Amino acid sequence: MSKVVLASQLPNKRNASLAPGLKQRHVTMLSIAGVIGAGLFVGSGHAIAAAGPAALLAYLIAGTLVVLVMRMLGEMAVASPDTGSFSTYADRSIGRWAGFTIGWLYWWFWVLVIPLEAIAAAAILNAWFPAIDTWIFALAVTFLLTVTNLFSVARYGEFEFWFALLKVIAIIAFIVLGAVAIVGGLPEREVSGLSSLMASHGGFVPNGYGAVLGALLTTMFSFMGTEIVTIAAAESKDPAKQITRATNSVIWRIGLFYLVSIFIVISIVPWNDPLLIQVGSYQRALELLDIPHAKLIVDLVVLVAVASCLNSAIYTSSRMVFSLAKRGDAPSVLKLTNTAHVPRPAVLASTAVGFLTTIVNYFAPEKVFTFLLASSGAVALLVYLVIAVAQLRMRKQLQASGQPIEFRMWLYPWLTWAVILFIVAALSIMLIMPEHRHEVFATALLTIFTVCLGLLNARRKPRLGEDYAGKTARV
């Protein structure tokens, strides 16, 4: 059995209880493909069906938001790499209650991703092996990836490297194939192209800009996970360099994997194709190109994407709750690590909740699981909002301390304020839209409850912390 090591017993170094086990290629591939999830391959069909070709606008706006948020997060992470990422920065710059709240909300978001991705993987596997129940597949996939996360961070990195590589190959192959078809390189396949689609199916904005707004709210959540690289980089040998590289590359990553590939889909599949939502945008595009075994190909790619997301969900949730425990904002047992510097209690606790919610999905009333999902529905926007507010305050702290700012947010503070206003507007719009209102209410209830717990925890367990000027202060 591995010897358990308390974080406090390790040398006094940044993240000393976690080892820099991620190699450069691990972090690089994670940063490249971390943004590619099952939502791109399947969920994009809903956005296209709702907004038509103007779904490109929705993805462009959402992608721009993510680029700006990642720039702000990159500024803070380069200045102070930390496994807790934005939760730690909120703790230091806004207040302990803020770090507590957003850390636990983020953890909750990812432990709910575990059953979602496990169920999606199980559905694909059950279609291939119908004799085995889906809940068995769901638990088996979760168990397998939990085991890989228990050994070492390098195991997580290696699995994620190959998952990411396969996703990148699949997207690039699709883009190349689609581009060849659009320019007439596949003479036996008729592809109308974007201009013809715009003329034949109601124009670029066939359902009005209200539909684009609805699609925007959907697409914004597709990018959740881009920020994981700032958490993972803290377990690499040169976190500041890795974060800088990942943040600088986010523009072309979103442009290539989302905008270009969605453009290809729209150029091949009419937005009002009745099968677009039913089978997914990428499968429908391959079917229209008469690619043999289109469903099998897409199912394999989606299975890889789902496994990748599940793997990252286990890793990310465990690291966030580990960071909370180190700061005294979670049970102290969750900051224990073994000799491989893996926070096994944090991994097991996060996965246990994931297992529980998977069981709830199969055996509890449907309304229970629906409410659980709704409670995390607006967490992505809250995370982005906290990152923006923390960056506003942390920049002032860094300047006051005299610490050089090696990586800067553009047009500070104007772009930061623009992001804050945009997020507040998006939350307000969600509140008045019937299809999103329940998500805002459920997330708001959970947030208020967590804030109260955070304030109570700070009062009951005061701790000493260091601000960026190096002074000791009561928080």
UniProtKB/Swiss-Prot annotation:
It is a multi-pass membrane protein. It is found in: Membrane. GO terms for cellular component: membrane. It comes from the Bacteria. PROSITE patterns: AMINO_ACID_PERMEASE_1. Keywords: Amino-acid transport, Membrane, Transmembrane, Transmembrane helix, Transport. Pfam families: AA_permease. Disulfide bonds: none annotated. InterPro entries: AA-permease/SLC12A_dom (IPR004841), Amino_acid_permease_CS (IPR004840), GABA_permease (IPR011265). The chain crosses the membrane at residues 27-47, 48-68, 105-125, 127-147, 163-183, 211-231, 250-270, 296-316, 345-365, 368-388, 413-433, 438-458. GO terms for biological process: beta-alanine biosynthetic process. One of its GO terms (molecular function) is gamma-aminobutyric acid transmembrane transporter activity. Induction: Activated by BauR. Disruption phenotype: Cells lacking this gene grow normally on putrescine, cadaverine, and GABA, but growth on beta-alanine is completely abolished. Involved in the degradation of beta-alanine. Belongs to the amino acid-polyamine-organocation (APC) superfamily. Amino acid transporter (AAT) (TC 2.A.3.1) family. This is Probable GABA permease. It comes from Pseudomonas aeruginosa (strain ATCC 15692 / DSM 22644 / CIP 104116 / JCM 14847 / LMG 12228 / 1C / PRS 101 / PAO1). The lineage of its organism: Bacteria, Pseudomonadati, Pseudomonadota, Gammaproteobacteria, Pseudomonadales.
